[in-house]
Amino acid sequence: RNVLETRRGSGTYVKDLVPTDLDPLNLRNVEDKVTLAMNLVDLRLILEPGIAELAAYNATDEEIEHLKDLCDTVEYKIEHDLYYIQDDIDFHTYIARCSKNKVVEQIISIIETAVLMFVNLTHRRLRQETIITHRAITKSIAEHDPVGARSAMTMHISYNRAAIKEIYDARNRELENQEQ
């Protein structure tokens, strides 16, 4: 059942067993977490702007009010230096729900679960950007402005990508220096 791991020159070990619902993409075992973070943010950049666009087309007035509440909660927690990561994930997951695409809802929950693995890489760096872009995303969805929603989500994920890219590049420079 793939529970043993043989390490050359070291022996055989029982693998770290994590329920698949906590790691549905089985990414916990990927050793290069920084590259994994880049891969995940690139996937988000491909998917989430289109999801926000669908949400702008399909969100009901009631859903828009709830989305505004989620946006306000994230903003409040950021401004009061409270843990907001789960609320941020709830915000993105709810946008997927507003898209009215059942496949998107499932995919985004899997991606957001994976994002939890590396969220500490960026969340302290992007507090103000998160507030500004979440507001823009919410406003565009509330106004049923699909182009605005797509653009705002692209900006939001791009900020995340830039922060992760800085870490990725710094790590690669460090590895190059170690090889010399």
Locate predicted features.
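Conserved amphipathic alpha-helical segments that form helical-bundle/coiled-coil interaction surfaces
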Residues: L40-N120, E129-T138, G148-A162
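A glycine-/small-polar-enriched, mobile loop at the entrance of the PLP active site in fold-type I
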Residues: H123
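Short beta-strand-centered segments that line the small-molecule binding cleft or hinge
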Residues: L126
